[in-house]
Amino acid sequence: GVVDRALGSVRLRVRLQGPGGHAWGDRRLPHPVFALAEGLCRVRALVEGREDASVNASGLEGGQAVNALPQEAACLLEVRALEEAALAALLQGVEAAFAEAARAHRVGLALEVLGRRPAGRTATPRLLQAAERALAEVGERPQWLPGSTDASAAIERGIPALGFGVYRGGGAHTPGEWVLPSSLLEGQRALLALLRGLGVG
C-alpha cells in the first residue's frame, strides 16, 4: 500500500475532578466518572456517520474503591481527520463537549494536548509514479490510502514524502495481529525498486 496523504491527529489526556466521598453518604456530590462518560458520549456523537474523521478513547481510569466516589476520572483521547480545518473544528467540538459535561456535573476539567500530527499531502507526481512502478515490478497495484505514519514528520515540514510498503497480514492492534514473514521479502523488493526508480542507490 501507499500512504500518500497524512491523516491529521491530536492526542489528549482528559481529566475530570470532584471532591470524592462516600458512595452513599455523599451520593449527591459531583461524580467525575459519570461526567467523563457523558463527555465521551457527546464526543462520539460528533463523528457519527462521518467518513472523514474519527475519535478513539482508551486508558480510562477513575476511583479505587467500589464504595467511594472517585476524586478524578481520566482517559486518553485521539481525534483524527483528513483535513486540517476539519481537525481543528473537531477539536473545538471535543473541548466544548467535555466543558458542557463538566458544567452539567459540577466537576473540574483539564485537557492536556499530548501530541499533534498534521494533515496534508506533499508527494509529488514523480514520487507517486515511482511508487506505482515499483509495486508493478512485484506484481502489485497501489492502494492509495490516508494514514498516520513516519512520513507525517516530513509532510509537516513541506518535504515530499509518502508511506510505502508491501506485506500480507491483518488484525492490526489486536491480540490476533499477524504478518506473513515471506511477504516482507516482496516488500523489500518493492522498496529497492522504488529507490532505483528515484535514482537512489
PLM feature segments, named:
Residues 4, 11-15, 21-201:
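Metal-dependent amide/peptide-bond hydrolase catalytic core
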